[in-house]
Structures are given as structure tokens and as C-alpha cells.
Amino acid sequence: MAEVKLGMKTQVPASVESQKPRSKKAPDFPIVEKQNWLIHLHYIRKDYEACKAVIKEQLQETQGLCEYAIYVQALIFRLEGNIQESLELFQTCAVLSPQCADNLKQVARSLFLLGKHKAATEVYNEAAKLNQKDWEICHNLGVCYTYLKQFNKAQDQLHSALQLNKHDLTYIMLGKIHLLQGDLDKAIEIYKKAVEFSPENTELLTTLGLLYLQLGVYQKAFEHLGNALTYDPANYKAILAAGSMMQTHGDFDVALTKYRVVACAIPESPPLWNNIGMCFFGKKKYVAAISCLKRANYLAPFDWKILYNLGLVHLTMQQYASAFHFLSAAINFQPKMGELYMLLAVALTNLEDIENARRAYVEAVRLDKCNPLVNLNYAVLLYNQGEKKSALAQYQEMEKKVNFLKDNSPLEFDSEMVEMAQKLGAALQVGEALVWTKPVKDPKTKHRTNSGSKSATLQQPLGSIQALGQAMSSAAAYRKILSGAVGAQLPKPPSLPLEPEPEPTVEASPTEASEQKKEK
């Protein structure tokens, strides 16, 4: 028994030891970033209401010191259009973490969206000091300098961005700067490099095709537009440009077939309805042409090319008062184009307002130094008024322009223009066919009026297509993959590269609007 008791005594301490309470759990100290994973999850799922609820809870727990929660809330405010509120929150993030370049980039972007481009450049320069190898900072600086019209600085920054990381949007912005400076050759070189880097980018292919189209290099234009349509058969900009090329060469039915496809994608496009209207004009369906052009004018009331075409069609239909109305409106928007004044003078002549017609011709002669039709029409008016000496002076000026054009280009003149010049030369006793030595090719379409008024132009008609501006404003979809564990600071969503604003578009070749009215 003694041994048993002794054994029990030896077991008691072990049992008591096992029943002692364990040491208390370590206290939970508040972790500022403990809800970051949940905030990030709601944000990438675009569940912004739930995201804002978690952010509010997190900021209450951390007394407003959670940088990531503030950052994401600022992003949501920006998406909702509250740019000023987002700017203030990004500035708070910059105060909490002054060495973080991402915070400064977002501050600068908000300033840019508020139109404060100079302030944005200053903040971007501060961010560049913290991270000198960020292509995004260089690109956005280039965009800001572009809006400030400091094109040299903008080019330097964009070239730096390309050295750090080649990106389609940077090429587009650099090409746009060259276009703003009027340097079409350099713009084409930039877009060629961009196409080499990204050969399947339909925006770049379409833009390059349009630039070649503007230069009249139809083979290369058709090649690049065809490539764009190969990768994206529904690319309405390329289809519109291809239709314009066909329209320029008189294939109105084929062009209308192309435009029918485009109308499904962009039914409210002013250039589309302008082109359709001029196709009907080339087919001599004038009522349909006016209907389409007036729709284009309704969609773009300040486009002078549409007004020009409306004036031209009304002249063809002998509706001279309406033609005067539209041509006057076009002159208000484009006061430096001599051909508009010539057409206005034709309308005024048929309205029997000779004094104002003479003034319009004087202005047309002053502004247009290349088109012999201006001088020919003016000479006809002067001859009809009995001023043969002044008419002879205008006729001789016309001869100089014709000789210059024949020496410098293989241009074929309108047969009715040649006939009228020969008749006027005979009437002025200067002989016939003095400058018309080349055979004349009849145009496909001629538009006459009972009053004997016909105007024509030696250049391609105006206002057929305006697709390049949209092509130059592609959006960047630049994102990073965000990952992280509970309690870890997640990477912040990057600031998107700034996108160029759509500018007034570069025109491609118009249609048979060159069949204008020349006075007889």
C-alpha cells in the first residue's frame, strides 16, 4: 500500500501541471493594411459600392492612415468624374508616402484632367526624379508639353519614352506632333516605325494609309488600308477611306456599297453622309445629294467643306440664292480660300448683283495664285460688262497659270474650260488654242446650267473624308497584374498613359465635287 500511495503521489504533480491555464494569446495589434486584399478584390471586380464600404471601415480603424485605401478611393472618385476630390486624396497619399512615384503620377494625371497642364508637368518632373526609368512619366510629360505647344520638349520626352519602352500610343502621339507642325514626311516615318513594331495594329495601319492617301500615293494607301481590313474587316475608318479612294476615281456605286457597311457602325458620321451625298452628286442625283449633305450639315454645322459642297450642288441646280447662303457660311469658316469667293461670285452674277460679284472675284484673285479658273471666270464677267482691257489682263494671267501647271504636272484640263477659254481668246482677239496644246480628256460627269455658268477646279474636290483624328486617339489599356497576401501592401493600379485628344482630322481626297460651274 505504501508503494501504491507513493506512486499516486508521483502522478499528482503531472496531472496538476497539465490542468494549469496556458499563457494568454498575443494581443491583436491593428494592422493598417489588413483589409487591402479585400479592397483590391472589390476594385478589380468593379464592385465599387462594396469597395467604398470596406474603405470607409478601414479608414475608421486606422484613423485615416491607410494609404492604399485612400489611393483606391481616389481612383473610384476619378472614375465617377469627381476629379477634384480624387486630386485631394492623391495629394494625401503623396503626403503619407512622399518617396512613392506612383502617388505623384496620379496627382499629375488628375491635374491634367483638370486642364492644369503646366502644374501637371511640374509634378511629373518631381516623379521623374524618384523614378528615372518610367516610360509612362516620359510619355505623359510629352502629352502635357504638346498641350502647352512646346513641341520640341514634347518630342524629347516621347523619344525618351520610346527608348525606355516602345508603345503604340507613344508613336501615335509623336506622329500627331509632326502633323501639328505640318511635317507630313516625318509623321509618315514615325508611323512606319510604329507599324514595324506593331504590324497588326489597325489604328496605325489606317492612319498610315490615310497619310499616304493625303499625299496621293494611292498604291501604298490602298496597301495599308487593305492590311487594316485584313486584321479587322469591320474597321469603319479603313472602309471609309477605301470608299473615298473609289469615289475619287469615279466608282460611285462601289463606294456607296462600302459606305453602306460603314453606316451600320457609325450612322451619325458627318464625313460619311458628306461622301454619300457627293456620290449621288457624281451620279447626277441632285435631290438625294442635297438630302444627304443637309444631314451631314445637321451633324456638323461648322464644317466648311460640307457647306462648300452644298453650295456647289445648289449652283448646279440653279438655286442661286441657296448657293449664296451656303457659300457665305463656308467663307465665314474658311475666309482664306479663293475658290469659295469664286463660287460666291458665280452665284452673285446669276443673282444679277454684278458689283458684289466683282468684289468677290477681286478677293478670289488675291487669295488664289494657282487656279486659272478664277481668272477665266473673272475675265468672262469683265468682258460681259464691256471692260475688254481688264478682261484681257485676267486672260493673260490665266495663260501664265496654265503654262505653269502644264510644265509642272501632267494635269488634264476640263474640255468645257478649254472651249470657253478659246472662245474668250477669240473674242478678245488674242487667237485660239494659245495655251491648250495637250489633248483634252472629257470628264465623266459634266453639270450645266441654262444661264451658261459653269465652274470647275483643277484640284481635287473638298471635304470627302475626315477619319484620321479618331484614328489618332486610341486608348491605352495599360494594366499591371496585382497580387498580394493578407496584411501585405498591394501594388497600386498604375496611372494610365495620357491619351491625345481627337483633333480636327486630316482630309483625304474628296469626290467629283470638282465638277463645278464655269462662267460662259
From Swiss-Prot:
UniProt note: phenotype after gene disruption: Males are sterile due to a loss of sperm flagella. In mice obesity is associated with hyperleptinemia and resistance to the anorectic and weight-reducing effects of leptin. Although mice are resistant to the metabolic actions of leptin, animals remain responsive to the effects of leptin on renal sympathetic nerve activity and arterial pressure and developed hypertension. BBS mice have decreased hypothalamic expression of proopiomelanocortin (POMC). BBS genes play an important role in maintaining leptin sensitivity in POMC neurons.
Region (Interaction with PCM1): 101-337
Superkingdom of origin: Eukaryota
Region entry Required for localization to centrosomes, spans: 1-66, 338-520
UniProt-annotated stretches for the region Disordered: 1-26, 488-520
Pfam families linked: TPR_11, TPR_16, TPR_8
Localisation per UniProt entry: Cytoplasm, Cytoskeleton, Microtubule organizing center, Centrosome; Cell projection, Cilium membrane; Cytoplasm; Cytoplasm, Cytoskeleton, Microtubule organizing center, Centrosome, Centriolar satellite
Oligomeric form and interacting partners: Part of BBSome complex, that contains BBS1, BBS2, BBS4, BBS5, BBS7, BBS8/TTC8, BBS9 and BBIP10. Interacts with PCM1 and DCTN1. Interacts with DC28B. Interacts with ALDOB and C2CD3. Interacts with PKD1. Interacts with CEP290. Interacts with DLEC1.
Family note: Belongs to the BBS4 family.
Protein name: BBSome complex member BBS4
